[in-house]
Amino acid sequence: MSKTPGIDMSSGSLGQGISAGVGMALGAKLLKKPFRTYVLLGDGESQEGQVWEAAFLAARYRLDNLTVILDYNGLQQFGWQKPGEHMLPPIENPTLKWQAFGWNTLEINGHNIHEFVSAIQASQQTQGKPTIIVAHTTKGKGVSFMEDQFDWHARVPTNDELATALDELGQTGLFQESMAGGQS
């Protein structure tokens, strides 16, 4: 828990993060601690039953100190979330599903920082229920060869690809040097 300040844990694609987040938020409530818990959740991992069990419990315990940010881009590690292409169907209409579980729901353009900040601030004002921010995003947005390409889920760019991507995003100099880590 000491490598990245404010980041207490990371989890894989099986939905464990939200369960841990619910536990942290519940612990804070029980101990009367004033902190908030934030969970990043992918739409692909929302196919896991554990996510919905945690969602139910968070609403049941009125965890208004919990904010989940759902990255809703339609892609998961091995492809698009389309009916018939996977064993599990995609999570359609996530806002309605989370509302049905008793959550406060906010929808934003996940690429708009102003909408993002406003949603975080709104989530902090919600009382009596947890909040989910459904952030509609495009995987790899702004990089021509990465945009909407599921194979970039876990792939590291080469130095040349990194340079091209940073150029397309308008990033140069020190940032580019600090991000280098791939192979040419």
Per-region residue spans from a language model:
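Acidic, glycine-rich active-site loops and adjacent beta-strand->loop/helix elements
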Residues: L41-E48, Y72-L75, H111-I113, K139
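Short beta-strand segments
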Residues: A25, L40-L41, I69-D71, V134-H136
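Short acidic, glycine/serine/threonine-rich loops at helix termini
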Residues: Q50-W52, F78-P83, S118, V143-D148
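Generic beta-sheet signal
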Residues: F35-V39, L66, K129-A135
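A short, conserved beta-to-alpha structural element at the edge of catalytic cores
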Residues: R60-M87, E92
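Conserved thiamine diphosphate
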Residues: K33-R36, Q81-A119, G170, L174-G181
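Cofactor-binding active-site loop characterized by glycine-rich and histidine/acidic residues
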Residues: M1-R60
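Glycine/aspartate-rich loop-and-adjacent alpha/beta segment that forms the canonical ThDP
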Residues: I113-S184
